């Protein structure tokens, strides 16, 4: 066949072209289109898939790393919490102990103050008793001296004079050198 016959077979104006109606295309045209698409797009698609796979793997690695960091921070926070709870418990116990000691110290100080106050009270009472006794003693002695003075100022009676002489004689007879 020559070239003219081929041109004569083909209707004018139709020529080679792409049939865009899929239902009218045959399997060969469809296979050719799929082959061309796979050939040109397949490489780009496989590159895109590899890039996507690499991105997903990187994201998984980063997620695992962040998860391990988060777990490590969680463990550190847990340790810090336990340490803080232990310190709080120690502080609470120490506070309770100090409160007890302070209470006991205050109670002991109160007892000592009561003892000192009682001693001071006794000393004060004793001082005022001694002062009162001294005043009474001074009063009695001054009265007695006053009465003696009055008796000396009065003339002595015979009976009193005889009593004194008898007393002095009795004392002298008792005296043995």
Curated annotation (Swiss-Prot):
The gene is atpF. F-type ATPases have 2 components, F(1) - the catalytic core - and F(0) - the membrane proton channel. F(1) has five subunits: alpha(3), beta(3), gamma(1), delta(1), epsilon(1). F(0) has four main subunits: a(1), b(1), b'(1) and c(10-14). The alpha and beta chains form an alternating ring which encloses part of the gamma chain. F(1) is attached to F(0) by a central stalk formed by the gamma and epsilon chains, while a peripheral stalk is formed by the delta, b and b' chains. The chain crosses the membrane at residues 22-42. Belongs to the ATPase B chain family. Pfam families: ATP-synt_B. In plastids the F-type ATPase is also known as CF(1)CF(0). InterPro entries: ATP_synth_b/b'su_bac/chlpt. F(1)F(0) ATP synthase produces ATP from ADP in the presence of a proton or sodium gradient. F-type ATPases consist of two structural domains, F(1) containing the extramembraneous catalytic core and F(0) containing the membrane proton channel, linked together by a central stalk and a peripheral stalk. During catalysis, ATP synthesis in the catalytic domain of F(1) is coupled via a rotary mechanism of the central stalk subunits to proton translocation. It is found in: Plastid, Chloroplast thylakoid membrane. One of its GO terms (cellular component) is proton-transporting ATP synthase complex. One of its GO terms (molecular function) is proton-transporting ATP synthase activity, rotational mechanism. Keywords: ATP synthesis, CF(0), Chloroplast, Hydrogen ion transport, Ion transport, Membrane, Plastid, Thylakoid, Transmembrane, Transmembrane helix, Transport. This is ATP synthase subunit b, chloroplastic. PANTHER family: ATP SYNTHASE SUBUNIT B, CHLOROPLASTIC. It is a single-pass membrane protein.
